Curated annotation (Swiss-Prot):
The name this protein goes by in its record: 4-hydroxy-tetrahydrodipicolinate reductase
Active site: 145, 149
Single GO biological process annotation from the record: diaminopimelate biosynthetic process
Species classification: Bacteria, Bacillati, Bacillota, Bacilli, Lactobacillales
HAMAP family xref list: DapB
UniProt gene name: dapB
Length: 255
């Protein structure tokens, strides 16, 4: 018997990709699916539920969540309370919510993962950006996603800004007296760094980190052209959280 998995949001693009992946792994067993709008009672032989409360009696080890920002915290809290180790790709968590979930998981002795990005290339981009920030404190982030993404900026962009801030000398990027003739033209501001969000049909998930210095520039870019790019990270998350006793934020903490 493999690792028993519940997938929340199985009808979405990421959830359906995760379901296909899990069905092709010998050590994974999908035991339940959750979607509040699903009309079918089972899908490909797997029981389907509309209410998470109905999953309390399910014998499962891992809760995979690709739902929506407005329900992600509640779902993850529920999963930990029920003893399901969460692997969450849904973004939009606040810092306080993450702290709350880490504490709850520690109290319950349950592993878990909230990952802004499951692509290995995106993790490397963040690592390289952190190293570069020591030498290039002038930096801006541009993240580009499909036009159905509900939160902005992306969790990956926020995580990138967080890791950069560990090494970066905090400065205000741009002219101190600059004026926006059109409000929002300079994007969001995170500790003096500007973050810009692009939403267009045809995109999947992309990010650029632009560094500037006297007479030179450095651009780091990662592109996910297909949602398959995230599945290696999801596999790692599922296999690792069952060995842990506390939730972590960021896939890199399980590598």
């Amino acid at each position: 018997m493999g690792i028993r998995i519940i997938i929340a949001g199985y009808r979405g693009k990421m959830g359906s990709t995760a379901l296909s992946m899990a069905q092709n792994e010998e050590d994974f067993e999908v035991v339940a699916l959750l979607d509040p709008n699903a009309k079918e009672k089972e899908f490909q032989g797997i029981p389907v539920y509309n209410l998470k409360e109905d999953l309390k009696t399910i014998d499962a080890e891992v809760w995979v969540d690709f739902t929506h920002p407005e329900v992600a915290f509640e779902n993850t809290h529920f999963a930990i309370e029920q003893g399901f180790a969460p692997v969450v790709g849904t973004t939009g968590f606040t810092s306080k919510e993450i702290e709350n979930l880490i504490q709850l998981s520690s109290d319950k002795n349950i592993g878990g993962l909230i990952a802004p990005n499951f692509a290995i290339g995106a993790l490397l981009l963040m690592e390289f950006a952190e190293r570069a920030a020591k030498y290039f404190p002038n930096v801006e982030i541009i993240e580009l996603h499909h036009d159905q993404k509900k939160d902005a900026p992306s969790g990956t962009a926020l995580k990138t800004a967080e890791v950069i801030s560990k090494e970066r000398q905090e400065i205000t990027q741009g002219h101190p007296d600059e004026v926006e003739s059109l409000p929002g033209a300079r994007g969001a501001n995170y500790q003096g760094m500007h973050i810009h969000s692009v939403r267009l049909p045809g995109l999947v998930a992309h990010q650029e980190v632009l560094f500037g210095g006297p007479g030179e520039g450095l651009t780091l870019r990662h592109d996910s052209y297909d949602r398959q790019s995230f599945m290696q990270g999801v596999k790692i998350g599922i296999r690792e959280v069952v060995k842990r006793n506390q939730l972590v934020y960021g896939l890199e903490k399980l590598l």
